Amino acid sequence: MPIRHCIVHLIEKKPDGTPAVLHARDSELAESQAIENMLADLNESYNAKQGKAWGLFHPESGAHPFSGWLKEYLDGGKDFTAFSRVSVEHLQKLMEESNLSVGGHVLFAHYQQGMTDYLAIALLHHSDGVAVNAELDVTPSRHLDLGQLHLAARINISEWQNNKQSKQYISFIKGKNGKKVSEYFRDFIGCQEGVDGPGETRTLLKAFSDFVESEDLPEESAREKTKTLIDYASSQSKMGEPMGLEALSELIDENQPRAFYDHIRNKDYGLSPEIPADKRTLNQFRRFTGRAEGLSISFEAHLLGDKIEYDETAGTLIIKGLPTQLTDQLKRR
């Protein structure tokens, strides 16, 4: 993963309305294995993060100047350090306007993954721990807690520059503590939601369930195709990449590679050609499970409404086509 430019600044800020203090670095970080490891760990943590949103820049304006500074940097009008400096100064001002915000180390990293250029921006915090030194003494230790990302965004620079119709070249963490906590960071980037990741994922799963039903697939085949969909979606999510409908269709049925894709288009589900996979929605699709005293139930979601009927009023499940192994045990009781 080639790292083109990387820099870290520090903003000291407490959530009590006191002014934010900026400690800006005046040069880029030199290339090192530590930087590569940090960025790799950051990407892994970011990709695994649930609750992300996808969108695009607001039109450049006084309220949303970041995209203009980024374009100026990419066009050669600003070097990376100057771009990051003017950006972090803007972030500092927005932090001061938000009483709920806290400071931290602000990372800017322009890197390449495959043929795609990305800009990652994250507000990082430290965790206190312990370490054993060369003299085998236990000593206090501080490290960047990359596993606890709350404010971060990633811009697909290549998508932004080459696909003017795209509405999902920015991904960002929405924040689980409520909109106000992360609103200032979204304003800093100047982005608006363009794609409803959970909604698009739910629609895709509905289209898949309809497809399985329309094809009248045997249970084993339906299970295999479900696993293929979940595995592909999970793999794309882990890499931070969207699901491509055509690629997914080819994986689901190698003999009829366009069958699922044509089903989606013919039924007009309104899905985008590429969908950001929402992990929480995918996890809910995998299986329904429940336990009670002496009872354990687990079944794949696509069976609901087909081999499994749920009566919410009566609080009952009706299971059709019991497994042979289970019926044999019941007969021998």
Swiss-Prot record:
Coiled coil: none
The protein's name in its UniProt record: Nucleoid-associated protein PSPTO_1265
Subcellular location: Cytoplasm, Nucleoid
Main localization category: cytoplasm
Cytoplasm listed as a keyword: yes
GO annotations of cellular component type: bacterial nucleoid; cytoplasm
Domain of life: Bacteria
Family designation: Belongs to the YejK family.
Gene Ontology molecular function, alphabetical: double-stranded DNA binding; single-stranded RNA binding
Keywords tagged on the record: Cytoplasm
Organism: Pseudomonas syringae pv. tomato (strain ATCC BAA-871 / DC3000)
